[in-house]
Amino acid sequence: MPTDNTSIAAFIDALPKVELHVHLVGSASVPTVLELARRHPDGPVPVDERELRAFYEFRDFPHFAEVYESVSSLVRTPEDVGTLVSGVARDLAAQNVRYVELTVTPYTHQRAGMPMPAVTEALDLAAREARDRLGIRVAYIFDIPGEFGADGARGTLDHALRHPPEALVGFGIGGIEQCRPPHRDAFRDAFAAARAAGLRSLPHAGEMTGPETIWEALEGLGAERIGHGTSCLDDPRLVAHLRETQLPLEVCPTSNVCTGQVADLAAHPLPRMLEEGLFVTLNSDDPPMFNTTLTGEYRVAAEAFGLGRAELASLARNAVEASSLDGEGRKAVIADIDALG
């Protein structure tokens, strides 16, 4: 007879999922990086699989930054961008992820000298192939690298408005939150233009900084969802506002531990966020680099936070409701979640 642990694990594996907070470069698995490393053998990444797996094992945040930058240096052509998307889609489809909003930082591709129309073509082709071959729908969020200030904002907006992929649904900002205040007006202007063009405002906020960054995302950027948002609990007024509006929060527990935002899973605020009645979704952020997966995040929610089937299914439904899936797509995924009982 299966134990409760094996039963919940099987339930999580079978659970239809939606991923809202995952970065393209940070999602590159070892097989995908190995393909890129062999394509560009002059890069800083080992071309031996065993050495690459050792290089990929998470140690600390500085090492994560080194791995991330090393992988980024291998993304040199539109073909490389398409290879990344295809690899991420394959990994997610294997976890029963039906839909993903994949965060792309086009400004880094611009700085690498890639022709932006060709990058868009690669994104479109990879999304179509993922849907046709794997049954997973891939949408995109274009993300300003906040540390590049006004130049990053203008470059990201330019690509979003002039060369948008077919499945571009959102406009975001990531990077080092502490770098944002001097460029606040440029970011506000870029988000206003993106919203006017029909893109959803989906910024990171409240991960590395306090509630003030979340307030700025809400009031200055018109946020419809918040990436991370874990510091909201430090401001009772903000908690009340988020509870009243049910604005979705993209929570990434393993990432928060790995980046040092919380000491360990026992200290993670997700259980309290749920107790406060906040609208929480589970996400993986940079999964291979943090030794996790979206399925793994649901297991963390069960094992570390004590959530049962009904609560896990509720988190899965939240992700569907917070997504940019069309009405029929939402109904289909929710029906499959409900069918698990």
Task: List each model region and its residues.
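Catalytic glutamate of the conserved HExxH
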Residues: 205
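Metal-cofactor-binding active-site regions of metalloenzymes
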Residues: 1-199, 208-213, 220, 224-225, ...
